[in-house]
Each structure stands twice: as structure tokens, then as C-alpha cells.
Amino acid sequence: LGVNMIYVEPMADGWAVRQDLVDNHQVFSSGAKAEDAALRLAQRLANAGQPSEVRVYLRGGALGGRFECRAPKAEA
């Protein structure tokens, strides 16, 4: 599998966190809460062996931030 993509995007009534591989999205009242949830999700997935990337989009549509969470390296 490749990198799991997680997006934080503005909505009319809050901020959404969505993933390419999941149909349902989560909605938060603030961008900060959505970003925090997305980063925690990405870290959990990475710890489970699924590298993830979070992309945070601003209200105007511009990319506001990009974060990578890599899977831990296997010990030799």
C-alpha cells in the first residue's frame, strides 16, 4: 500500500477531516480541532505500519500545511 492521504478542508459549517479510503468524514467546529484530529489519526495509522500524509487546506482553497507520518522502522 502507498501513503494514506488525510485532508483537512473547510466546510460552510466547520472543518472536515477525510481520507481517500474512507467514505465518511468527520466534522469539527474549528480548523485547529480538525487539524489535531487528523494528525492524531495519521500518527496512529503510521504506528500501525501505514504511512500517512495530512494536507490542511485554508478557507480560500490554498494548501496551508502538509505533514508526513512515517511508519516506524523495523528493528534489525
PLM regions and their residue ranges:
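A short, polar/proline- and glycine-enriched secondary-structure boundary/capping micro-motif
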Residues: 27-30, 76
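Conserved short hydrophobic patches within well-ordered secondary structure
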Residues: 8, 17, 28, 42, ...
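A short, charged, amphipathic alpha-helix used as a generic interaction element across diverse proteins
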Residues: 29-51
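Short, surface-exposed beta-strand-loop junctions and turns on beta-sheet-rich folds
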Residues: 23-26, 34, 71
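Short, mixed-charge low-complexity intrinsically disordered segments
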Residues: 46-76
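Short aromatic-glycine-(Arg/Gly/Cys) micro-motifs in beta-strand/loop hairpins
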Residues: 1-25
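Surface loops and adjacent helix of pleckstrin homology
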Residues: 20, 30, 68
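Surface-exposed loop/edge segments in extracytoplasmic proteins
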Residues: 23-28, 62-65
